Amino acid sequence: LNRYEPIPFQPADGIFPHIHDFFAHIFGEQVELGYDYLQLLYLRPLQRLPVLLLVSDERNTGKTTFLNLLKSIFGGNVTFNTNEDFRSQFNDDWMGKLLICVDEVLLNRREDSERIKNLSTARSYKAEAKGRDRREVEFFGKFVLCSNNERNPVLIEAAETRYWVRRVPPLPYDDQHLLAKMRAEIPGLLFYLQQRMLSSHEES
């Protein structure tokens, strides 16, 4: 069963200065990798991607705004989970999503870490809904986690390569209308992603 929903915007040639500045803020010196990440989400939704973890113990960093921007771009293919949702045995409501976002993540038990790692590379998983039998479904979800806890929001071993961790500084400005401005630029962003060459190459 394919639950993927149409993206709510159509690409159109245009500029996206607010999105570009915001991406530069979130991804810093890795901004081209940030565009790669978004481009793969958009054009190759089945591609396996690392677990993106944005951390900062400071306020007004834009982490939640980043999640809301992803929701604006990908619409119903994005779901917001709590820590409790992620730990629940009932997962049918998010098994078919492209992006599973957790704000204020605190999944620092070993079983949490193992589940995230397994899901980040899984091709299929057992979906379970209340009152229904478990069933195996194709899984292509990617995780975006945000936390104010810089030390141990998720248990990550030293040699682990399935996480992409970014420490996000405070925004240099406070713009209450930033998300609305970026939403208006999404068609231009999508057009750019369709034309853009990836800056990185795929590795297993």
Where are these regions (language model features)?
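P-loop NTPase catalytic core of nucleic-acid-dependent motor ATPases
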Residues: L1-C101, S113, W164-R167, L193
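Catalytic acidic motif of RecA-like/P-loop NTPases
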Residues: L106-L107, K117
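AAA+/SF3 P-loop NTPase mechanochemical coupling elements
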Residues: F90-M95, E128-C146
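Conserved catalytic/switch belt of AAA+ P-loop NTPases
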Residues: S113-R135
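Conserved alpha/beta core segments of nucleic-acid transaction machinery
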Residues: Q195-S204
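Conserved Walker B
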Residues: E104-L106, R123, N149-E150
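A short helix-turn-beta junction within AAA+ P-loop NTPase domains corresponding to the substrate/partner-engaging
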Residues: P153-Y173
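Short glycine-/polar-rich loops that comprise or flank the Walker A/P-loop
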Residues: M95-L98, F139-K142, A158-W164
